[in-house]
Amino acid sequence: AFTAQIIINHVQARDDEHIDNMDQALDRAVANGVKNLVVQPTHLMHGAEYDELMEAVEAYKDQFASVKVAEPLLGEVGSDAAVVNDDKKAVAEDLTAEAVKTAGYDSLDAAKEDGVAFVFMGHGTSHTAKVSYSQMQTQMNELGYENVFIGTVEGEPEETACEEVIKAVAEAGYTKVVLRPLMVVAGDHANNDMAGEDEDSWLSQFNASGKFDSVDTQISGLGGIKAIQDLYVAHTAAAMAEK
C-alpha cells in the first residue's frame, strides 16, 4: 500500500495500475481473514506520513488478533541531534559506500584526497522528527566521514538548507561535489529539486556559487541499495519476533 494518495492517483492515470491506500489494504486484510498483522513502513523515519500510517492502523487494530508495526529505515528518533543508533549507522555506511563506488573511487578517503565532498539531500520536515537529519550528520561525523554532508529540500533543520550546506562544503575546502538523494525513492525531488535545470535546484545553486570546480549528481534512491533492502527485512523480522 502507498500512504500518498496523490502518488496512487498519478500511477493510476499514467500506468493504469491500481495501488491500495492504507484503508483499502487493511480492508483487504480483514476480508482475507488475516489474524496477525505485521506492517513494515518503507518510510525513512518517524515523520508525518509515518504518523498517518499509524493512525490508519490504529483504526483497524480491533479487527486483528495482533498488530505489529516495524521500524522505518532510520529506527527510533531519539531526543536530540547527538542521538544515533545502529540503523542510522548502517544507512550512513551503506549509502556512503554506494555513492563512493558510483563516483568511481575505491574509498571515501580517496575521494577526499581528490577534493570531493558528498552531499546527501533529504526532504526535510517541520515535524519533530526533523532532528533525524541532524542525527545523520552526527553519525557521519562519528564515522569519520569528514567529506559527507546532510542537506534537505525544505531546509528544516536550518543547518540543512542549501545555502548552509554550500557554505559548509566550501569552508571545508572541497572543490568537487557529488549530490545524491537521502530518500528511499529518487522521484520528483531528486530529479528536479536536486538535479533539475531550474536556477533554484541544488545543482544550479552549487554551480552558481562559483565555489566548486565540478558538481555531479547521482539520481538513485536508497531503496535500490541491497544492504538497505536487507535492513528493512531485518526490521520486519524483529517486529515478527516481538512477544
Predicted regions and their residues:
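Active-site-proximal alpha-helix that buttresses catalytic centers in soluble enzyme cores
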Residues: 1-243
